Amino acid sequence: MATDGASCEPDASRAPEEAAGATAEAARKEFDVDTLSKSELRMLLSVMEGELEARDLVIEALRARRKEVFIQERYGRFNLNDPFLALQRDYEAGAGDKEKKPVCTNPLSILEAVMAHCRKMQERMATQLAAAESRQKKLEMEKLQLQALEQEHKKLAARLEEERGKNKQVVLMLVKECKQLSGKVIEEAQKLEEAMAKLEEEKKKTNELEEELSAEKRRSTEMEAQMEKQLSEFDTEREQLRAKLNREEAHTTDLKEEIDKMKKMIEQLKRGSDSKPSLSLPRKTKDRRLVSISVGTEGPLTRSVACQTDLAIEGTDHVKKSPLTVPGKPSPGSAKGSVCANAAHVRPGMDRQASHGDLTGSSAPSLPPASANRIEENGPSTGSTADLPSSTAPAPGSAAQSPVAAALGPAHSAQSPCTPAPAQPGLNPRVQAARFRFQGNANDPDQNGNTTQSPPSRDVSPTSRDNLVAKQLARNTVTQALSRFTSPAVGAAPRPGAPPTGDAGAYPPVGRTSLKTPGVARVDRGNPPPIPPKKPGLSQTPSPPHPQLKVIMDSSRASNAGAKVDNKTVASPPSSLPQGNRVISEENLPKSSSPQLPPKPSIDLTVAPAGCAVSALATSQVGAWPAETPGLNQPACSDSSLVIPTTTAFRSSINPVSASSCRPGASDSLLVTASGWSPSLTPLLMSGGPAPLAGRPTLLQQAAAQGNVTLLSMLLNEEGLDINYSCEDGHSALYSAAKNGHTDCVRLLLNAEAQVNAADKNGFTPLCAAAAQGHFECVELLIAYDANINHAADGGQTPLYLACKNGNKECIKLLLEAGTDRSVKTRDGWTPVHAAVDTGNVDSLKLLMYHRAPAHGNSLNEEEPESDVSDLDDGEESSEGESKPVVPADLINHADREGWTAAHIAASKGFKNCLEILCRHRGLEPERRDKCNRTVHDVATDDCKHLLENLNALKIPLRISVGEIQSGNYGSSDFECENTICVLHIRKQTSWDDFSKAVSQALTNHFQAISSDGWWSLEDTAFNNTADSDIGLSLDSVRAIMLGSVPWSAGQSFTQSPWDFMRKNKAEQVTVLLSGPQEGCLSSVAYASMIPLQMLQNYLRLVEQYHNVIFHGPEGSLQDYIVHQLALCLKHRQMAAGFSCEIVRAEVDAGFSKEQLVDLFISSACLIPVKQSPVKKKIIIILENLEKSSLSELLGDFLAPLEIRSPESPCTFQKGNGTSECYYFHENCFLMGTIAKACLQGADLLVQQHFRWVQLRWDGEPMHGLLQRFLRRKLVNKFRGQAPSPCDPVCKTIDWALSVWRQLNSCLARLGTPEALLGPKYFLSCPVVPGHAQATVKWMSKLWNAVIAPRVQEAILSRASVKRQPGFGQTTTKKHPSQGQQAVVKAALSILLNKAVLHGCPLPRAELDQHTADFKGGSFPLSLVSNYNSCSKKKENGAWRKVNTSPRRKSGRFSSPTWNKPDLSNEGIKNKTISQLNCNKNASLSKQKSLENDLSLMLNLDPRLSLGSDDEADLVKELQSMCSSKSESDISKIADSRDDLRTFDSSGNNPAFSATVNNPRMPVSQKEVSPLSSHQTTECSNNKSKTEPGVSRVKSFLPVPRSKVTQCSQNTKRSSSSSNTRQIEINNNSKEENWNLHKNEQTHRKT
């Protein structure tokens, strides 16, 4: 038991420990150190410290206990006093070690477990303690920061208080100042009132002065008006007196001729000669009387002439026809009579309101009154405008139209029955010209100035073949008529008493009796058959004009008579008159199968006398389609041919059809048989091919639908007939007639009181049907009979809606003028505007929007359809820009069921034109949305989107400004300050970046456009120097950009968008300012003058580097402008560097002396005395016009001081007052000069090595491309940045002006006259007038007469009059040129004019011939030059060509066998055969006559043309070679065109001047340009120039750099088309020689 009790103690004690441990575990889980407060943490820390102390005590106690236990366990087991130990010892010794369990727990293990647990707790508490310490530190730092912030807050609060105090003081001061300022304002207001009062007084005074001035102005204006009136009266009286004088002179001349003739007749009578010559006098007198123009007091003298194609009608009887009068033989006087087929403007149209009853009694045409008989240029017209009055009275309320027909009808056959004979020599040239005119051109205007073009018809679709047929018919007619005057008559004349009628019922007319037409009999000439009696039903009632009858006729263009060709359809106008016919053609018509009927009583067929075809029949026709444009002027042989339909469309309801589907040729049924003598009407209607019309029980509807006027009128005369009967579809007879466009039937039914507003089952009235089908005549009739113009069908369609839907503009206009409502909507919500836009019909939409209804009623007349066309084509376009739309904004913006407006429809279908018209209406709402929330832009196509985006875009011109240009003094009068380069489109969504990119891109494109060659591809490839074409401008050249008046730079942005900014600031343009001389740059100079910037900078560098520079070139090379701009730029550069600078300009003339130049240098501080120190001031001296004085005399003494500028090399100069002193040039002096001369001569050449020379050659940059670039920029400015296409006439005109300058200089260079070369300055003023090339030609003529011709004349005379014969020691010039020299000058001017100026002119040859007379020297006979050969001359004579800087540099004169054959030198001017090869067929005889007279005059001078010098002979030979040359490389490869250039060939007897064409591109070897050897009899002294300084320079060219001397031999290997070569002839071989300025002159001395 003791053992059990002992063993249970530990167990009993372990259970509470485990329970306490579990409780502690749960408490530990709930315990969280982070949630404890500071005080709790401190308490916990103290508790843990106490526990640590207790733990230390426990550990010490346990150590002591352990020691005791250890001793006991080790040594106590052997103690016999303790029985428990004995028992334990026995227990342990009794069993094995593994099986034994301790009796009680070992205290050491317990202690170790407790210690491990305590270590863990200690570590955990240490970590928690460290975390608590870190949080404590962070908290303390936050406290420190909080304290610092509190201190700063206090400081700021203190400062704020201080600032408030200061602000209070400032506010008090401002209040005081405001009080003071208010007092001042009051004082200023008082002063302003006083000033205003004074201003009012001044205004009153100025008003009084203005009134007095206006009164004086009125008086002066009245005086001027009186003066003008008197001047005009004087002018009128002077003209009248002149005219009277001319008439008296002409009358005197005639009387003189009569006297001479009478004298001759008296002499002949005295001699007893026969009396035949005496008969010619009255005849000629009569002829002259016929040709004379009739004045108001004279009666018209006409003469009737019958020919094979016309009917001569004479007399004034209106009741009976006059017999034909045939003269036996036309006299020359009557041959001048005008026989144009289109002499009268024929107007045969259908009289819609007049009814013709008795057609058999048609009156004969009568001659017009004296005032209407107009005699044209070619003589009196033979009954040209005959009036054919109507034989019946017009219907009441209608305007009667009198048909007018031409006396000479159109050609009735495609073939001319007689071949016109060629013009005889004895005929009058006017008749020959008329024959040539009408044979050559069928579109020429007639005698009255009218062109025979018919008005456009909607249903007419002529083909080119139809037009050719009509033109050929007119042409043949006139040819046949003229053949009566120019050739014997062919065929027998008709019997005088035979009336011009024939059997035309069963015998349709054909062209000739030999022409074959299937199914048609021939027309037999003879008396007409007896006229059968009239029908009973038609005898009393006047019937309307009948539709046309289809007649088959041969109208091909075959030249052989009798050829079998395709059938054509010809119809006559609805009148029985023989003239005024219309030729109507249609391509695909079936063969006629209608029965042949006897003629009606009203047939009046005219048979031509000599076998020509009759034009057409004027008879009644069943089922004919009326003319679409009655009342229009449609002459015979019209280009637009009407089409006779074969069928008529007929349906039960109105369906919208297109313009093509409502053409007559596309319909379904037609009765083509002519109503005549048939006993039964029903078989007549059913025969001939047409199918019976279904659903039409009555003949009335059938006749109305088919347009059978005869049947309809008969039925209407019957009693008891219901004319308003409607079929099952609701169609009445009036409806059917209106739908099919039968105007006459509609008129009959309306006169019979048919219901005008009867509707069918769909609600369509006859007016709806006519408007839908486009029958505007029916619409006009129905409106006149009070039809309801606003009637709406079941679907809401009004007549206006239907007309707009089908694009029938004539109907639309009639309805609008009648006052129809434009705002009626359909069931779907569509208005007429929707309908017009839906079909894309622009004309209909224009009418709806702009056409105004008349204020007082509607006046309808027969010429209304014609005015329709003109109003629509011309008037409406003008009204768009001037008048406002009459349509309100609500109608434009009206939406249908789907919410779509008219703009939605136009945009979605891509009808850009319609959308543009809608957008012009200010009330349009493009942002309006449909029911799907879509705007117009959302549903638009790409094109329409672009249009909508640009709708409100601002169009701002972009201009480049170069600043103010001083004009007049420096040759810059033609330069423009500003140039428009493009137009910027600024939209609402445009950003500043987009705007900046657009401006930059526009500038870049513009600079490239004016620099590149582009379409300026001239024929001469030698001028295409593209290497130096770039002018060097870029965006860096821009100084500033002005948006109106606001400066702006690229990339800068404002708060407003560009669109808002431009509108707010009212910026009308964007100006780009280029950097100019004021900024030390030359960009503006380069742009103004079109000289490349790189070259200008190079010139400026030469001035700065060498100080002495002279610019020289031909006159007009802009030397003065360049020098002045360089001086300005240099001045501003020096001023920017801190130096003062001054420009001194002096003009040199012939009287400018060296002493004056010395005074100029001294006064400007360029020449400084040796004793004086140099100044720091910069001086720029400009000497202009140095060519007017001798350079060697003027600058000879200054050469050395200018080269060496220092006090060590002084020079003594004499002043103007006579004193002299030593001076020197200082370094700060710049000297620039200008010379308007291409080369130097004589002693002046000594000056050239002391200066730096800038040569402005016309064939090199910058001058060569300057004119091209300048004119291109001028053109771009004219077209506001949009350069036209190369095919535009204005581009060709500019090309011509450019080529004139180049070819002119090339020809002048070849003639050896460099002093006549011109710079581009004179051509800068070339006018750029689009569409008026005549202005440029007139300008060119003025330039030629004022500048070019005098210079050429002076240069040629100075060269031709210089003699260098051995007997004379010096050069002499003749004051009065000989006749030979004058001939040479005239020849040179004429050749230059033809080869350089007139060649390539864009005007037609006929217009150019009119302007040729304005050019001086254009009438010289050039063939004289071609046949001229100079007299004998010496071979070794000195060369006359002193200098030449042209591209065709001259070699020495070669004495080759070709130029010096003995037979040629002896021949002189023996050959007088004139080979004037001007192949211009339009040249008048008078010009040729004057040319021959001039030529004969020159030939009379031939014996005296022995030229006194060899230079004249050289000139003549040079002119001859220029005339014969056709492959000149330096004249832009002038084409061998006989029409554009007058070429000249020498005769066969003169082989020396036969044009030997050399190959200008043949390579030349080095031997050919070497110095000439001894066997060559050529002297090239003027080519050589020294290269050694010791040899004096006698003759030279202006300078070429010495570095180029070595390149000369290589340059000569190039082709001769280059600008430095020339063609010469040596033994028929093409050889050439380069002229160089620095060749070795010793070769010249050896020769």
From Swiss-Prot:
Modified residues (Phosphoserine): S1509
Keyword Cytoplasm: yes
Signal peptide: none
Subcellular location, record wording: Cytoplasm, Cell cortex; Cell projection, Dendritic spine
Residue spans crossing the bilayer: none
Classification via PROSITE patterns: ANK_REP_REGION (PS50297), ANK_REPEAT (PS50088)
Listed Acidic residues bias regions: 861-880
Compositional bias (Basic and acidic residues): 1630-1647
ANK repeat windows: 695-725, 729-758, 762-791, 795-824, 828-857, 898-928
Modified residue annotations for Asymmetric dimethylarginine: R484
Biased composition (Low complexity): 362-372, 389-411, 488-509, 1609-1623
Molecular-function annotations in GO: protein phosphatase 2A binding
Keyword Hydrolase attributed: no
Taxonomy, superkingdom: Eukaryota
Alphabetically ordered keywords of this record: ANK repeat, Cell projection, Coiled coil, Cytoplasm, Methylation, Phosphoprotein, Repeat, Synapse
Record-linked Gene3D superfamilies: Ankyrin repeat-containing domain (1.25.40.20)
Region named Disordered: 1-27, 202-222, 318-427, 440-468, 482-604, 856-886, 1436-1467, 1542-1647
Broad class of where this protein is predominantly found: cytoplasm
Quaternary context: Interacts with CTTN/cortactin SH3 domain. Interacts with STRN, STRN4/zinedin and MOB4/phocein; this interactions mediate the association with the STRIPAK core complex and may regulate dendritic spine distribution of the STRIPAK complex in hippocampal neurons. Activation of glutamate receptors weakens the interaction with STRN and STRN4.
Protein purpose: Regulates the dendritic spine distribution of CTTN/cortactin in hippocampal neurons, and thus controls dendritic spinogenesis and dendritic spine maintenance. Associates with the striatin-interacting phosphatase and kinase (STRIPAK) core complex to regulate dendritic spine distribution of the STRIPAK complex in hippocampal neurons.
PANTHER family: CTTNBP2 N-TERMINAL-LIKE PROTEIN, FILAMIN/GPBP-INTERACTING PROTEIN
Protein name from the UniProt record: Cortactin-binding protein 2
Gene this chain is encoded by: CTTNBP2
